[in-house]
């Protein structure tokens, strides 16, 4: 079909004010910065009316695609297949695992009726019994289960519940003798205890050895779940099962450092409680350790501050007595494993598994009472190795696999489970059994079977291209085997490039369906700012060097066209959250004609205001701080809102945000689209925004129906903006 007709300069009106903010620059002194759309930061009737008008205008454009409903139906069908997690054996003798029959919004927690591992290879038939079904927590599917944890005794199940995807959760507790499979009358589900622990955000649930209570992180109560005020004054509390939250003990809070946040864990033997302390989103934390007190948790936990300077990343793997094993990047950008002896006056730190210079250590688990399984990422492909109790590499596991792997296990048990996935691998779970003969230890436990799609019809390859400064960057390219690399295919280019997060291969039935339907390819460049190659790769794409991230992303699109992987003008870029920032920044930076379309979901766009809202202060380690004069110049230069060009044609652009997004607040998308529409009113391609007022959070936990409808809007926009032809026969 030809691109949907577009009449420039037809947007709903947007008021401009004379608001000006003044910043301090180390090179320029006082810098006045006009902010005519400052009023879009507010929760006001005017903003509500404006977003309603803009969204209705966008919907009018989307409604012109006659294939949109048909595309939504194909997306929904593509998601209808059985999904599952690796199982875990509790001390109670029950196996537990998550299972989704197809299009359930949330996976259901099942358990075995006997201590024997169920036979999961019996087709797609369900095995075991339902223990906890989070889909019945609310009639409309808006109650979402987040983190959850069983007590060491297996007697209790603690689970966090959020509504409409907000980042704040309430933790509930229920006995494992009480299942939930039908719609409840009580908040959090019938059969639970009266405990309700509120205002938890980015929390872990760490049970104490005696199973009498757990540690969690919370914030002070707010007037509203979607208040935009800056997050501060996090605290770690201890909740004793069967008591009210008012009785909870604060075990850690630092009023002098209100931006600090915390994570907790406990050793599997119950000997130690671990506390990690973060000052921002950088890969630097403190590590404090305390021995579990048999008399219970008290307000003044005697923390031993093993690592008490922010300089590197430290995360405990396990302990053998007083010797703890820690994964760290101290003097090792690619990470290594060290041991720390807590029995000495001054903790002794020694290398255990040394750094590999050409591969990043991403995950390490202790297995079978002292062995270790380590996953390395070499050129963005996972490799799995088994190590001895002495730290010697013994063997490589599943050497023929290409993709992403993860480990599920309990270290005292003789079995571990490896989950494999990739662009055309929906999911395979293998079991590694130390009690079996060497050649029979690794076996397939369960394989995902699709309905409608054939994953074998797709293939992926990895290429390397040069960025603007000559740096070589890897990129995955995925296609349906019938799609030719002859310069005629449209391309979907997805990226992230920030916070040391790796853009791993991922399985998406919706993406594969779109590719098959329109003959498109998928490109995923592993740009700087991510974690693909350790700390140096991240450092090369943050703060002052953040421009490299955009250069890498733009160069990827140019490479696709030049080498005939994609057609000129047919590259559509997409990204969410920080990836949305990547999209917005690339739109305003790229030469005219580089992209044909762009979709940003919940993206950061106003870099002069981001750290004033919710958790934004933590991102200053990534973006810089606009209120520090030494940072101001490079932050302003990075900000999409403040760098919209007036002298060139921009690609068709759709910004998607939720009205109550409490992580990346919607003002980012609102102000960016207002500037786009004002600066280039005669742009021959639409510059649109869709504000969802039915969902509050950053995108977490959407129902299957809602996720499918959102995807249909997104990909329908791409198809109609690029003028893509429906190729498959239905």
Swiss-Prot record:
<comment type="similarity">
    <text>Belongs to the peptidase S9A family.</text>
</comment>
<dbReference type="Pfam" id="PF02897">
    <property type="entry name" value="Peptidase_S9_N"/>
</dbReference>
<comment type="subunit">
    <text>Monomer.</text>
</comment>
<dbReference type="InterPro" id="IPR023302">
    <property type="entry name" value="Pept_S9A_N"/>
</dbReference>
<dbReference type="GO" id="GO:0004252">
    <property type="term" value="F:serine-type endopeptidase activity"/>
</dbReference>
<feature type="active site" description="Charge relay system">
    <location>
        <position position="577"/>
    </location>
</feature>
<dbReference type="GO" id="GO:0005829">
    <property type="term" value="C:cytosol"/>
</dbReference>
<feature type="active site" description="Charge relay system">
    <location>
        <position position="698"/>
    </location>
</feature>
<keyword id="KW-0645">Protease</keyword>
<feature type="active site" description="Charge relay system">
    <location>
        <position position="661"/>
    </location>
</feature>
<protein>
    <recommendedName>
        <fullName>Dual function macrocyclase-peptidase POPB</fullName>
        <ecNumber>3.4.21.26</ecNumber>
    </recommendedName>
</protein>
<dbReference type="GO" id="GO:0006508">
    <property type="term" value="P:proteolysis"/>
</dbReference>
<keyword id="KW-0720">Serine protease</keyword>
<dbReference type="InterPro" id="IPR051167">
    <property type="entry name" value="Prolyl_oligopep/macrocyclase"/>
</dbReference>
<dbReference type="InterPro" id="IPR002470">
    <property type="entry name" value="Peptidase_S9A"/>
</dbReference>
<keyword id="KW-0378">Hydrolase</keyword>
<dbReference type="InterPro" id="IPR002471">
    <property type="entry name" value="Pept_S9_AS"/>
</dbReference>
<dbReference type="GO" id="GO:0070012">
    <property type="term" value="F:oligopeptidase activity"/>
</dbReference>
<dbReference type="Pfam" id="PF00326">
    <property type="entry name" value="Peptidase_S9"/>
</dbReference>
<dbReference type="InterPro" id="IPR029058">
    <property type="entry name" value="AB_hydrolase_fold"/>
</dbReference>
<comment type="function">
    <text>Dual function macrocyclase-peptidase involved in the biosynthesis of the highly toxic amanitin toxin family of macrocycles. Cleaves peptide bonds on the C-terminal side of prolyl residues. The enzyme first removes 10 residues from the N-terminus of a 35-residue substrate. Conformational trapping of the 25 amino-acid peptide forces the enzyme to release this intermediate rather than proceed to macrocyclization. The enzyme rebinds the 25 amino-acid peptide in a different conformation and catalyzes macrocyclization of the N-terminal eight residues.</text>
</comment>
<dbReference type="InterPro" id="IPR001375">
    <property type="entry name" value="Peptidase_S9_cat"/>
</dbReference>
